[in-house]
Structure formats: C-alpha cells, structure tokens
C-alpha cells in the first residue's frame, strides 16, 4: 500500500518534545509514521513510543514502519489515550504529539471518498466504521445536517447548504464524491 507521509514541522516537533532516549512518547495520530519514526529513532531499548490511529490502513503501515524500533501501534482514537495507556501500564508519559486533520493518504486514496479531485463512493470515514457520508447526507434531517456543517465544518452557510442537500436528495440520492449538483446549487449563494 502506498502511504507517503512527509512530516510537517519535524524539527520543531522534535525540539518541542525534547526527546530523552529512555522516555515514553505518544503519537496520537500516527498516520504514516513520519513523525513517529524520527521520534523512535532517538529512543533506546529503555524508551518507548506508542502510536494511536483509528484508520486501519494507517495502523498497518505504521506497525510495519516502526517494527525496528521500541514502538507499539494501537488501533484506537487518541481520545481513548488515557484508558489505553493505563491498561498498557505506560503512564505517565514524557510527551504527546497530535498532528490533527485528514491525512494526505486519506485524500489521495480514491476509495476513501475524501477527495474533490477523483470520483469515488461518498465515504469520508476515518476508521471505516459507522455511518458513511453517503448514508449521512441521504438520511439525516435538514436540521441535523445544518448542525453538523456548522459545528464540524465551521460553515457559515450551513443552513443553506443543508437545505440544498435535502432538495437534491429528494430528486435523486447522493452517492459519489463528484456529484456536483449540490455544490452548484450552493455556490450561487456565495457568488
């Protein structure tokens, strides 16, 4: 699986963590293990890196890339960090990294449905569990769509966009990432 990850602000992250060779560090969003590999390279056998990710693709790639180092990758969201680390017996820790947002792998992998550049099923799930974006836009109420767009997308035109999505899905369900009719209807509002 192709999973390219160029870590952003790598030197700043390493400086900020002030890595001790025998320290315990957590990457709460391990992804392609770009940051984690560089952290783990600086650890001795007395140190440890624990990587978290809810994306099974990322867990598989990171596990392979971190195999030569004192590192463990777990398939959990970082919001479960305290519980998981306590169960592993590795608290307290010396540093935590969270590189938040959608990864380039998720954007580049057509089947994930995040890309605006490729036609794909409308998925947009980080962990491949739960409701897909297709199910969401075709089933939730206009009010709930508006709340989601406003809360998570910080979208000031959330009500208008939700209204247009509901109108569009009444004509024909929305299935693909490149179905532009909803965007075209909403764009006139911004023009």
Task: Give residue ranges: language-model regions.
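S-adenosyl-L-methionine-dependent methyltransferase catalytic core, i.e., the SAM/SAH-binding region
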Residues: 1-187
